[in-house]
Every structure is written in C-alpha cells, then in structure tokens.
Amino acid sequence: VEIEAEGGDYDDVYDDLADEGFGVQGDGSLDEDGIEVQVPASNGDNTDKLVQRACQCLEKNGFGVSKRCGLHVHIEYPSQMRTIKHLLLMTYACEPVFYAINPQSRLNNTYCQPLNKRFSVHEIIQTNAQKIDELFYSKKYADLTRSKVRTFKRMKWNDCRYFGFNLHSLFYQKTVEFRYHAGTTSHQKIMRWITLLKAILLYVRFRYNQEDVLRLIEQPAVLSKIRYLKQLLKLDEPLTDYIINRYIKFRMHLCAE
C-alpha cells in the first residue's frame, strides 16, 4: 500500500516510521511538501495494523490529501498469462464502479488512466493469453517485438504503469497495482478498498466465468453493476452499503457542479 499525502512534517513521519520498515519518500506528482508512505508487505490482520499505524502517523504530523494525491495498492498475484488475461477483462468490467466511487479528478488523472480509453472488450477476449503482455505494452509503444516486451518487463519504470490497473507491476515485480483510489489517510477507507480488490482477485483466480464478466460489462448503470458485483463476488452487506454510499456521494457532487 502506497499512501500519498501533503502539507505536513516530512521529517517527523520519517523518524516515526522508517525504523519500523515503512518506506518514506517524496513524490514527483505532489508539491514540495508531499510524501509517499509505503506500507510493508503483509497479510491479514497485520496489514490492518500497519495501515492504521501509517494513517495515524500522517494525521498526527499534519498531513492531509488533495486531488493530486492517490492511493496505490499492490497485491502479490500469480503471473500465469491466462489468469492475467482474465484479470484484465475483469478489471475493465469493474472500472466504471471504481471511478464512480471516487472523485471525478481520478478519471481525469494522468497517473490512473482508464483502460476503456485504450482497450476494447473484443481485443482483450481475442488476444492469445500468451500475448497479453504485448497487448498491454502496445497501448503506449508502437512497433513492438517480443524482444522489446521482454526488455520492458525487466525495467522498473514504464509509461504503461500509469493506467489505473498497472499490469507492468505484475510483469516486473509479481504484484498487481490498482491506482484508481483517491488519496486518503482514512484507515477504514483503505481497508474497505483492499477488501474489495481482494474479492475481485480471488474471484478471478478461483471462480472466473467469462460470461458472468460480460454480463457485468453489459449492466446499464453503476448501481446495477454494484448489485451484480455483490452477487458475483459474494460481498457482505456492510461493504456493499459502503460502495453504494460512496457512489451516491460522488454522484451528488457531480450534479452540484
């Protein structure tokens, strides 16, 4: 988990967290007083405790968020090409919900670009699973060869990492990265977002059905997509209510503008 924030005392956060294994650094997408806290990789209850520790430290030292800030979640995931193809289509299907439960600034953000502006359902389905990496990199680079693709996958920095769903991270370091969420120092918001992402990843890994995913894409409105996701992912009522309430909140903001 990478938490971006602005406006506080960088040195105090560094002194509090660096010795506990957290990464603490500046971020080029933020102002000079910006910070990125990288929560150590962990599982289960420990993730919850570490995220809470980071959020409390940021708030204690005066940090908040602006529309420049994002929340990036990395989750270790199997890298078999067929599974990656399924995950790409499922994330494409979920994107309207992801953007609808976040501020409009995320949709128009250079650092979390939507898949649906560069990919189509048809091309994802028709692409051979063994060439899904080539399809992903082709959205930023012309005249790709397999040699170039192999080179890209060994490099830390690549322009394709700025999609809301960053497959480059999986090819490079075996973690999928989701960049859709707006910046927050709320421990509860972060953990609910992680719970939703994990439910999606588990579905793709163990219960994936392409026809179900296509039906999700065909749902005519965000609320119907959320209700369909609840059934598909077996989401509990509190998480579903949270997602719906965020959708209503940001829809009202849009209507007021």
What are the language-model segments listed below?
Residues 1-65, 78-257:
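C-terminal accessory/tail domains of diverse enzymes
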